[in-house]
Amino acid sequence: MQKTVQFKDVSLYTESFGDSNNPALLLIMGAASSLIWWDEGFCNKLVDKGYFVIRYDNRDTGMSTSYPVGKPGYTFEEMSDDAIKILDAYQIEKATIMGMSMGGMLAQMIAIRHPERVKSLVLLASMYFAEGAEDLPVFSPEVQKFFDDYGDYRPIGYRAQVDYAFKQWQATHHSERKYDLDEIYKMIELDVNRAIDYNSKLNHSFALVTGDELTRIKEIGCPTLIVHGTVDNVIPLIHGEMLSKTIPNASLLTLVGAGHELHPEDNDCIVEAILELNK
């Protein structure tokens, strides 16, 4: 089911799966990535286990509000509050919040800003920002080179946008999992085709964090599951380990051989871990 959530000058495109009377699970995707990267197979596995699942396009992705490149009209705090607007629109009092990468950063902020709305937290391939974060490694040399080479690049035209996105996918998906690259290319074509302004996704690198929530994760009181791949070349495993050590009541699910990804091969074990989290 599709629903557009509107408030002020913001429009957020959402999709839901399953029975709205079931426990809710809200999915927040990472930087520059639309909702399609939450695989429908993963969503349906959660539905089969009794969840009502919502995924949505963050601002500047997919069919949600876009802003001129370099001029995002929002902060990350406002992006995190978007999730609450969506819960309100679906009349959901409390949900499991699952975020990947930047979505995990937003999920951490939500758990601090709106603890009464968060039943539990799932952080997939997410970054640690609290005490000692400045000493942790981030991008691998290969990923850093890609962003150094293409950091200011704004592809013009459909084919250039698809080719650029495919190069980015290749640079950031160091993994022992197998992929059908033709299917990935088709996914990227869909991503570009459905976007209001595909280049506006670059705004996630311009948006600012203005509060201190990310340094206060010791205050998170809900059950938390950290999921991280051992060969993640965008946000190394140490970030997941630090999150699990710092957040009270957190557990760590390590995906051996997985990178910065949600791979179908891992769907079952992640879903089972979420079920265990919410027992």
At which residue positions do the language-model features occur?
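Conserved HGGG/HGGXW glycine-rich cap/lid loop of the alpha/beta-hydrolase fold
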Residues: 10-66
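Conserved acidic catalytic loop of the alpha/beta-hydrolase fold
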Residues: 77-95
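Conserved hydrolase catalytic core segment
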Residues: 93-135
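Flexible "cap/lid" loop of the alpha/beta hydrolase fold
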Residues: 121-155
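Alpha/beta-hydrolase
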Residues: 141-149, 153-215, 222, 242
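Short beta-strand/loop motif that positions the catalytic acidic residue
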Residues: 220, 226-228
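Acidic catalytic loop of the alpha/beta-hydrolase fold
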Residues: 231-235
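Catalytic active-site module of serine/aspartate enzymes centered on a nucleophile-bearing elbow/loop
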Residues: 250-279
